[in-house]
Amino acid sequence: MKPFIKAIAGIANQDVERVALLAQVAELAGVEALDVSAHVDCVKTARALFKGTLFASAVSADALLKAIEAGADVAELGNYDDMYENGEFITASEVMALAEASLKALAGKAPLCVTIPGHLSRDVQVEMLHALADKGVAMIQTEGAIRLLKDNRVQALNADEKASLSLENARFLASEGRLPIMVASGISAQNVDLAMQTGAIAVGIGKAFNALDSQKAMRQELEACQVAMNQVLSAIA
């Protein structure tokens, strides 16, 4: 699998006009993949504007199947930011159950990428990696999580802390060599090089891209991410 950048519109972003804008920018920037909400209207809008690999994200097997039927190429389970915002922490068993339901619903129609919750211990994440690989999951995405549960207290993480945690999780999981790893959470042009050095095959760019105000700034961020990735790949070639 060739290393790639994935632009992330956001799992909670169901504003079709905004999704259309982000899809247009991603296409102009030349990134290989775009990730949108599995909401059918968002998927159809993005599919009409973006020629690369289209990921659709949800925390529902039914929503993922509908997204694939609407034109998405890859179903992605996660992320879980909405849950963390509400102080909810999805468990490993809950993710495994959702993954099994998603694989059953998809029935081979499309590959499944699963986000492993960033708040779980490394040992649990590794167990999940192997179990998901055995079940037929195609790719893992790491996250930093916007909140952690520590000593029974909810602890908020800033962007740098999210990125650091996601990078650490990616390095740990990539070293297992079971599945391709994608790094997301707090990743931007400033740390794409660190993301690639973890052994990951792909990098997800979210708020560093989708929270910007102008199309020019969004495109420049994605292009800078690609330049940074290519520099790392050239250095290790």
Role assignments for model-derived ranges:
Residues 16-18, 25-29, 38-39, 52-111, ...:
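Active-site beta->alpha loop and helix N-cap motifs at the rims of alpha/beta catalytic domains
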Residues 11-15, 63-64, 82-87, 118-123, ...:
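Short, small-residue-enriched loops and turns at beta-alpha junctions
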Residues 99, 126-129, 137, 170:
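A general structural signal for well-ordered alpha-helical packing
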Residues 39-63, 90-114, 157-185, 189, ...:
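Alpha-helix-loop-beta-strand connector modules within alpha/beta enzyme cores
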Residues 38-40, 72-90, 135-153, 194-222:
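Glycine-rich phosphate-binding active-site loops on the catalytic face of alpha/beta enzymes
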Residues 1-72, 129-137, 217-230:
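Conserved N-terminal beta1-alpha1 strand-loop-helix module at the mouth
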Residues 21-22, 59-73, 120-135, 175-203:
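Catalytic cores of alpha/beta
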Residues 3-9, 34-36, 54-58, 75-77, ...:
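Hydrophobic faces of well-ordered beta-strands that scaffold small-molecule active sites
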